[in-house]
Amino acid sequence: LEYQDALSFHMDIVPCIPLDESISNLMYEDINNYILDENLSKTITNHAVSITDTDKDNYPYIDSGWNISNPEGYALWFEANMNKSKKAMLLMEKAQVDNLPNFNKKTTLQRAIQLLKRHRDNMFKGNEDSKAISIIITTLATHAYNGEDNLAEALKNILTNMKRFINPHYPRIPNPTHPSED
């Protein structure tokens, strides 16, 4: 697998298996209590998997103690929130619009996150170990986003409201697709 290293991408490729049904049911309850959207919670839960971890003793064999991961569920959660402004605009205009591919044009949320990450990269240039990882910025910004169409307004509201989504206890910043995980 080759990708441009100069862009500082990070990719983990690990073996995975579908979640055990009992774990999946518990996870659905956890996600649904966190997201409060039954359909989205079900869809997200259906994408969760158990993954291996070479640092754990149970690595060589299938075990219910494997870590849970859900990158596809996270992408679905992000997309649902990214589309807030599109839905609001369509409702206000009562327009009939044909569906467009989701990622041809960046949404206000995507552009805001892009600017936040760029700011982070500039602020922590030369001090890479202290900068927030991208998933933290994306999660907090997505939570704080209220569907604004104007980029400046979206950034102002995101920056004002991000701190509301940082818990004083563990998990400090819950993973929306696995809320008990920090």
Regions found by a protein language model. Give the residues of each.
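Conserved catalytic core of two-metal-ion nucleotidyltransferases
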Residues: L1-S69
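Generic detector of bulky aromatic hydrophobic side chains
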Residues: S8-D20, Y74, I137, A141, ...
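Long, charge-rich alpha-helical interaction segments
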Residues: S50-Q110
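Conserved nucleotidyltransferase catalytic core and NTase-mimicking acidic/glycine-rich helix/loop elements
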Residues: N81, M89-D182
